[in-house]
């Protein structure tokens, strides 16, 4: 009797109704939980502010261009305490990456896409490095997203411990790897191009999903978030973007004469070279590019491009004309016409912001950018904290050069700013 009564009560209309509401509520809650951002993608866990607790530098003021705070940075860098601060060595990274879970958590890498838009637009990176493991870690962390792909080329002249440290970092991520073939990179020689080509081949074979390739060196740093980079790349609509201008006459000596590496340095042999095997004239540019996957495939497979590259191997600084020239060959995917009307300067292209000493000056009087706040090496500015405010208002994706040994706070403040900006998207 009691069992029959309970059965009638349980399966009566009101009870069945409330039971169904409960089940549907639980299902809805579960679905919402699945599509929520994981718990670790929280602002508190991934924010980088306060990573250097021993310093009282206010990065917000630095980024605003506050003269007093920037002067404070300069004084801090000169202190004995700062100069004797603990530094991470390759051996430290080898030890840290022996426990990948701990390393990723400690270094606050982002291991989930921050948006659907970013997840659906993977980017490939070629990173050429030879020293300063902490710089590589900071760069990789700043650009790392699980949907992207990262090839790291390590100079064969690098110390064994450095290579081991890079391999340790790469081992902690399924989408980060060391190039399958490594070169001994000599300044201004073909080996710099070959390093990027090696990564191009590996990345092209690794995945057909990535949309664009961006090449970097170990002293680059982003000045845009991953989402901002994705949106700028989408606006290109398949076109490549890199510096490509008419070849100035003073640079013609670089490819009209034959060069070879002698005792680790590139030397002019004085031998006159044959003209390039190309109808398109040679164009001047830089080592840095933002190119589509279709461009990469064409470069790797096209016979005409292969002949051009073979011809260029004994020239001076081929990276500063090769990519710029390929970008003006008509049949290359995403290329520009050879007419000078389509020339792009380094300030018009988005690939890289670089300050050259001989162009610095008063912007109000026609200079392209203000004086360097850091130091100069080979006429290139190694940025200081005072360079950030102006730089962040430019359209470029990356800037070169940064160095933890010149101005750590320039990198730290930029790093904090980009991470906070990226995490802000989670609130909307």
UniProtKB/Swiss-Prot annotation:
Positions binding UDP-N-acetyl-alpha-D-glucosamine in this chain are 128-130, 155-157, 187, 378, 401
GO annotations of cellular component type: extracellular space; Golgi cisterna; Golgi membrane; membrane; trans-Golgi network
According to UniProt, the name of this protein is Beta-1,3-galactosyl-O-glycosyl-glycoprotein beta-1,6-N-acetylglucosaminyltransferase
The protein's matches in InterPro entries, at most eight in alphabetical order, are given as: Glyco_trans_14
The catalysed reaction is: a 3-O-[beta-D-galactosyl-(1->3)-N-acetyl-alpha-D-galactosaminyl]-L-seryl-[protein] + UDP-N-acetyl-alpha-D-glucosamine = 3-O-{beta-D-galactosyl-(1->3)-[N-acetyl-beta-D-glucosaminyl-(1->6)]-N-acetyl-alpha-D-galactosaminyl}-L-seryl-[protein] + UDP + H(+); a 3-O-[beta-D-galactosyl-(1->3)-N-acetyl-alpha-D-galactosaminyl]-L-threonyl-[protein] + UDP-N-acetyl-alpha-D-glucosamine = a 3-O-{beta-D-galactosyl-(1->3)-[N-acetyl-beta-D-glucosaminyl-(1->6)]-N-acetyl-alpha-D-galactosaminyl}-L-threonyl-[protein] + UDP + H(+); a globoside GalGb4Cer + UDP-N-acetyl-alpha-D-glucosamine = a globoside GlcNAc-(beta1->6)-GalGb4Cer + UDP + H(+); a ganglioside GA1 + UDP-N-acetyl-alpha-D-glucosamine = a ganglioside beta-D-GlcNAc-(1->6)-GA1 + UDP + H(+)
Q: Name one Pfam family in it.
A: Branch
Keywords, comma-separated and alphabetical: Disulfide bond, Glycoprotein, Glycosyltransferase, Golgi apparatus, Membrane, Signal-anchor, Transferase, Transmembrane, Transmembrane helix
Q: List the disulfide bonds.
A: 59-413, 100-172, 151-199, 372-381
Assembly description: Interacts with GOLPH3; may control GCNT1 retention in the Golgi.
Q: Where is this region: Catalytic?
A: 122-428
Give the UniProt record's GO annotations in the biological process aspect. Answer: cell adhesion molecule production; core 2 O-glycan biosynthetic process; glycoprotein biosynthetic process; kidney morphogenesis; leukocyte tethering or rolling; O-glycan processing; positive regulation of leukocyte tethering or rolling; response to insulin
Point out the glycosylated residues in this chain: 58, 95
Question: What's the source species for this entry?
Answer: Homo sapiens
Q: Which residues form the active site?
A: 320 (nucleophile)
Q: What is its main location?
A: Golgi
Tell whether Lipid biosynthesis is among the UniProt keywords.
Answer: no
Q: Which tissues is this chain's protein expressed in?
A: Highly expressed in activated T-lymphocytes and myeloid cells.
Region listing for Stem region, in residue ranges: 33-121
Q: Where is this region: Mediates interaction with GOLPH3 and is necessary and sufficient for localization to the Golgi?
A: 5-9
According to the UniProt topology, which residue ranges lie Cytoplasmic?
1-9
The pathway it acts in is: Protein modification; protein glycosylation; Glycolipid biosynthesis
- Give the transmembrane ranges: 10-32
Q: What is its EC number?
A: 2.4.1.102
User: What's the superkingdom here?
Assistant: Eukaryota
């Amino acid at each position: 009797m009691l069992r029959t009564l309970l059965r009638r009560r349980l399966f009566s209309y009101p009870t069945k109704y409330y039971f169904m509401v409960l089940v549907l509520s639980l299902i809805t809650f579960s679905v919402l939980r699945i599509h929520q951002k994981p718990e670790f993608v929280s602002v508190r866990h991934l924010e980088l502010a306060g990573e250097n607790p021993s310093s009282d530098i206010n990065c917000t003021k630095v980024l605003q261009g506050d003269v007093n705070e920037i002067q404070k940075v300069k004084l801090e860098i000169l202190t004995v305490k700062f100069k004797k601060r603990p530094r991470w060595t390759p051996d430290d990274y080898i030890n840290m990456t022996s426990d990948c879970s701990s390393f990723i958590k400690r270094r606050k890498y982002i291991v989930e896409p921050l948006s659907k838009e970013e997840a659906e637009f993977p980017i490939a990176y070629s990173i050429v490095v030879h020293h300063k493991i902490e710089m590589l870690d900071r760069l990789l962390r700043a650009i790392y997203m699980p949907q992207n792909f990262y090839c790291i080329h390590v100079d064969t002249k690098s110390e064994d411990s450095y290579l081991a440290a890079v391999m340790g970092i790469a081992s902690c991520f399924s989408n980060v790897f060391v190039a399958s073939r490594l070169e001994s990179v000599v300044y201004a020689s073909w080996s710099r191009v070959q390093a990027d080509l090696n990564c191009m081949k590996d990345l092209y074979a690794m995945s057909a999903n990535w949309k664009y390739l961006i090449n970097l060196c170990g002293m680059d740093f982003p000045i845009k978030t991953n989402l901002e980079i994705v949106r700028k790349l989408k606006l290109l609509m398949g076109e490549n973007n890199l510096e490509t201008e008419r070849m100035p006459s003073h640079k013609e000596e670089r490819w009209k004469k034959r060069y070879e590496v002698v005792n680790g340095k590139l030397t002019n042999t004085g031998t006159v070279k044959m003209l390039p095997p190309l109808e398109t004239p040679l164009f001047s540019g830089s080592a840095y590019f933002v190119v589509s996957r279709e461009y990469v495939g064409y470069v790797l497979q096209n016979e005409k491009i292969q002949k051009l590259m073979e011809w260029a191997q004994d020239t001076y600084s081929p990276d500063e004309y090769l990519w710029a020239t390929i970008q003006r060959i008509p049949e290359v995917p995403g290329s520009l016409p050879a007419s000078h009307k389509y020339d792009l300067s380094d300030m018009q292209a988005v690939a890289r912001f670089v300050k050259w000493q001989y162009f610095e000056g008063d912007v109000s009087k026609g200079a392209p950018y203000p004086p360097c706040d850091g130091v100069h090496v080979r006429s290139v500015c190694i940025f200081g904290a005072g360079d950030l405010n102006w730089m962040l208002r430019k359209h470029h994706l990356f800037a070169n050069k940064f160095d933890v040994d010149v101005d750590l706070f320039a990198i730290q403040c930029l790093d904090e700013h980009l991470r906070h900006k990226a995490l802000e998207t989670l609130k909307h």
